[in-house]
């Protein structure tokens, strides 16, 4: 049964953010824990899957945690472009932000930060 909104699976510690019904989702892994469920025919995100959510939601003493988007390295250039476009667009960008970390000022590492306050508020 489809349920729009948030669905938390406690045994797997996975939070599903369902945007619309679609049985044809292809998953694009932004990293090992954050995946976009995409309707490939329409190039549209239908689900955001957050695995090990309790780890992703932990705050540090400095604020929310950010995670490298190392899943992009495994994608073709076309899929990488699509993943970045979708991640920057509604409804996905309501739940996460993408920025760039530049260690040493030369290397560019895309990172992702979840809006955990918004996720927790909507789950309550």
PLM features: residue spans?
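Intrinsically disordered terminal and processing segments
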Residues: 1-33, 40, 55-62, 66-124
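Short, well-structured hydrophobic secondary-structure segments
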Residues: 35-50
């Amino acid at each position: 049964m489809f349920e729009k909104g948030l669905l938390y699976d406690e045994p797997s510690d996975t939070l599903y953010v369902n945007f619309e019904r679609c049985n044809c989702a292809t998953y694009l892994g932004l990293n090992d824990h954050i995946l976009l469920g995409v309707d490939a025919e329409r190039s549209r995100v239908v689900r955001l899957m957050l695995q090990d959510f309790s780890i992703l939601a932990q705050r540090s003493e400095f604020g929310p945690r950010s995670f490298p988007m190392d899943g992009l390295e495994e994608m073709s250039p076309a899929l990488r472009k699509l993943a970045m476009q979708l991640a920057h667009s509604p409804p996905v960008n309501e739940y996460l932000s993408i920025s760039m970390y530049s260690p040493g000022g030369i290397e560019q590492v895309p990172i992702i930060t979840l809006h955990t306050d918004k996720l927790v508020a909507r789950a309550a």
